[in-house]
Amino acid sequence: MKKISTTLLLLIIAVLCHAQMAEPVKFTAQLKTNGTADAEIVFTGKIDDGWHVYSTQLGQSGPIEASLTATTTDGIQLVGKLTPRGKEINKYDNMFGMTVRYFEHTATFVQKVRFTKEQYHLECALEYGACSDQTCMPPAEVTLSRKGKAPAFIAAKGNEATKADEATKADEA
């Protein structure tokens, strides 16, 4: 009976400890289109107080920097590099022995893309590192997977239909 009680107590403690492990950074990902061939992949993170998310292109000896990996880009091409947006903090970090750039409270990373075919399929992931003054999370990632008809091609077909309607009306007049 004592072994069962001890095992049960250890199990309860493990569950409670796991429940207390908060996720200090929560990212959302979206593909923002504007009806043209150009669009943006936007990753927006909410960062808990006391934590920060590192920016892009920090160098090899630094912390885990934000980076984008695109595994599927059928009908869509990346344009340029992943770009940080928002209030970036530049600060010397004793742990890394270098000046690092990071975000507190919110972080936004944007990758420009261009649709190249009528149908597209995109799968990508943002990898990032986050730390507090006491600890760092292991590298984390947020994924985005989208497929469908490119907005620019939908708009172009709509314009062709409008022009055909106008030509028909002109012929009838």
Name each model-derived stretch.
Residues 1-2, 21:
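N-terminal hydrophobic targeting signals that begin at the initiator methionine
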Residues 2-10:
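Sec-dependent signal peptide recognition
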Residues 10-18:
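Hydrophobic h-region of N-terminal signal peptides that target proteins for export
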Residues 18-173:
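Extracellular/lumen-exposed scaffold segments
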